[in-house]
Design a protein with these regions (language model features):
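Hydrophobic/aromatic-rich alpha-helical bundle segments in the mid-to-C-terminal region
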Residues: 3, 124, 128, 132, ...
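Short hydrophobic/aromatic patch on the recognition helix
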Residues: 48-59
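Basic, helix-initiating cap at the start of DNA-binding domains
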Residues: 1-47, 64
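Amphipathic alpha-helical packing segments from all-alpha helical-bundle domains
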Residues: 102, 107, 111, 121-147, ...
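Helix-loop "lid/cap" segments that line or gate small-molecule binding pockets
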Residues: 94-101, 109-118, 191-197
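Short amphipathic alpha-helical segment with a characteristic S/N-K-E followed by hydrophobic residues
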Residues: 22, 61-66, 76, 89, ...
Length: 199
């Protein structure tokens, strides 16, 4: 089970319901048009219906809360172990699409991307703690594909990993992600990429 940034802070008594309500509040407010820069812990506390000190006891800064929000929308991945790495790649992409189809999750992810320069430390931790481990999952699947003889040895697995997710990120940026069917699109992307990397 992953430990969030705030759970590592000693001495804080946590109320899971309040924590969940604060995360939901950020998702609601950002999806309604609020910016990450414009929000404050005071505003979020008012939306939840608790005192600001209640939130300050949990998160010293809104950036800490935002990291917990990002952890919440990026749920842990399942174990990938199908007989063919190709199927695992398609399943991974389907999960990524399902996440971005969530309107509120998509709003927060786009907001973070738009305000990355305003929150460099948050953006760095999001990459290090959430994105990088997921990329490594893709790399492991690709290595399995090479070992199984599905994929041609010598490919640049980091570049191929970027090729796999690029169509999804492009659709998310343009607001056209809702037109995608997760399972069908995941398989289509993998089939197209495999034409260039299969053994």
């Amino acid at each position: 089970m992953e430990t969030t940034s705030t759970e590592r802070t000693a001495g804080r008594r946590r109320d899971p319901q309040t924590d969940a309500a604060a995360i939901e509040a950020v998702l609601d407010l950002v999806s309604a048009g609020a910016t990450l820069s414009g929000l404050s812990l005071v505003t979020i506390a008012e939306h939840v219906g608790v005192s600001r000190n209640t939130l300050y006891r949990r998160w010293k800064t809104k950036e800490e809360l935002y990291l917990d929000v990002l952890n919440a929308v990026n749920r842990p991945l399942p174990e990938f172990g199908s007989p063919t790495p190709r199927e695992d790649l398609a399943a991974y992409l389907a999960i990524l699409i399902e996440r971005t189809l969530d309107r509120r999750a998509g709003s927060v992810l786009r907001a973070l991307q738009a305000e990355a320069q305003a929150f460099p430390e948050l953006h760095r931790r999001y990459f290090d703690e959430i994105i990088a481990p997921r990329r490594e999952t893709v790399y492991r699947i690709l290595r399995r594909g090479i070992a199984a003889g599905e994929i041609r040895p010598g490919i640049d697995i980091e570049f191929v990993g970027e090729l796999l997710v690029a169509p999804i990120l492009a659709r998310m940026a343009s607001g056209a992600i809702e037109k995608l069917d997760p399972e069908t699109t995941g398989h289509r992307i993998v089939e197209h990429v495999y034409r260039g990397i299969q053994a």
